[in-house]
Amino acid sequence: MAAGTGLLATSLSSCAGPPMLEASVIDHRITVPLSAFVGSDFQIIQPEGFLFDIGLVKGADGKFQAFVLECTHASTQLTPAGDGYTCPEHGSTFDIKGKVTRGPAQLPLRQLQTGVSSDTVTIYLR
């Protein structure tokens, strides 16, 4: 592994719903192996020491988008629900791409920059 990249733990959540991957954060980056997307276009990343999970989505075009799963209304951890995320605090919902589908939230989820190499996706937390 190159210096300055995050290490992804191999443990997957056994609960129903999208896979959840625990990740180390190094130099404000997380590295996810592309092999994590075999059979799934969506992963929940649980960054070590980070307040909120990250939704990592692989689009039909093969591009990746990462969103901080923090409600933009109540600053609450969102939970995966159907084809998006729900805020347990006041019921705001967001689609898989972070767009508000039901308020009271009005702003989309914060998107994080991603980069792809031959075998990994890097999520930049800054």
Regions found by a protein language model. Name each.
Residues 1-16:
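N-terminal export signals
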Residues 15-81, 108-126:
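N-terminal pre-ligand scaffold of iron-sulfur
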Residues 36-39, 93-99:
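Short Pro/Gly-enriched beta-strand edge/turn motifs at strand-loop
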Residues 47-49, 89, 96:
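Structural motif
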Residues 69, 90, 97-99, 126:
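Surface loops and adjacent helix of pleckstrin homology
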Residues 78-82, 95-98:
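Short Cys/His-rich "knuckle" micro-motifs
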Residues 85-91, 101-110:
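Short cysteine/histidine-rich metal-coordination sites, predominantly Zn2+-binding motifs
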